[in-house]
Amino acid sequence: MGRRCIEELVEFRQQLYNCLPRWSDALFELTDAALCASGPVTSVPSLSLEPEFTRSHGSLYKALAKGRIDGDRLRRLLVDAAPKDWPLVFAVDASTWDRCDAECSPERGFYYSASKHSAGQPIVAGWSFQWICQLCFAPDSWTAPVDARRITPKEDTADATIDQVRGLVELLRDDGEVPLFVFDAGYDPIALAHGLSDARAQVLCRIRDDRVFYTDPPPRPNRPKGTGGRPPRHGRRMKCSDRRTWGKPSETLVMTDPRHGRVTVTAWHGMHPKLCGRSRWAAHERPPIVKGSIIRVEVEHLPKPTTRTKKTLWLFWSGPGTPNLDACWRAYLRRFDIEHMFRLAKNTLGWTSPSLCTPAQAERWTWLVVAMLAQLRLARRHVDDLRLPWERPREPAQLTPVRTRRGFRRLRAVIGTPASPPKYTKAGPGRPKGTRSPPRTRYPAIKKAA
């Protein structure tokens, strides 16, 4: 088992090298330098000082500026390398690479940021990247990133998400299991459900507790044609915050969880909202009827002591058949693992640390970070546990991503690298004497129309 897993890591590294058509050696050594660095990556140029990067810092800059990554091939590689024993449950979320002061960087947009403010508002200018990570139900923070895409300011977030999910579904194995995609409350569940209605996918999205939904209208008695007016499109009204309007649930699940105590999951199937003929529905002759299941999750207590008293969660599900209530509420709680992945990518691997100029360079660096995360997951059972004196010993299967990264340098010395050694040459002539570079073009951040 162990030998087969390490062979998978070696094969993944070779295939990753094949996904780099231009500046492959420098780009691959850049990933090794970031994985083998002794501390968090705070400066990408400093990675050229790591022994795993055998080239100069100039090659590092040129690799990010002029290199090329085959995104389609790398996406297929990530899907094939994902754990086969994990369920087809995926978390989808976007994170912002803030570039507030980068006036020379094009295609910046304004995005919400909970930790950084601009002019007193939680809004920053930068690039938005949407990640898709496969989740597991094991009690750890490991995820398997399978895709990352930059959403431009001119794109509609819902349309971009639908295209990204469709592209991933085409790459997944078709063994009868329908993939479940979990979204936070910032996404439009109705738009996603409508756009993915003909895809092999389930959509699970958190909704506010003041949303209103409707049942199907009751059947009308037979009447002569041309009498009775237009038939109703909506039935009984259900407001999530008003218990009196709920009606009889379609399905109820009660269980006991060691972390949350008594868990009650209630579902109402065949519900739909009342849509207006504007925004994305303006092109429709009549707003569509988008049906789904409303799921209410109530827990006895939260895992840790907190001042928060709200212990109720509302979800909207859509997909073929009816939802698996036990899988739905557990999948949404595991969705928060993608937040841990973002923290690892930013604080440890330095995803948003480099001050890159163009979005194309940012996309290349993002793909490299995704490849780093995949290598850490494949190497978790083969690295030495270089724990700090105050840390408890762990079994190889229980190592965290950060502790796995500490031992990657020793493992890399054993498995080697597919990158070729550098070819030494003399320095070039440089810039002709007396020439000056013209001022660079300024690009204002794009404000998306409401």
PLM regions with names:
Residues 26, 39-42, 55, 59, ...:
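Generic alpha-helix structural propensity
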Residues 1-23, 103, 139-450:
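Single, function-defining residue in the core of a domain
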Residues 36, 49, 62-67, 117-122, ...:
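Short secondary-structure transition/capping motifs
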Residues 50, 77-80, 167-172:
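A generic secondary-structure signal
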Residues 32-34, 133, 369-373:
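Contiguous, well-ordered alpha-helical segments that form the cores/surfaces of helical PPI scaffolds
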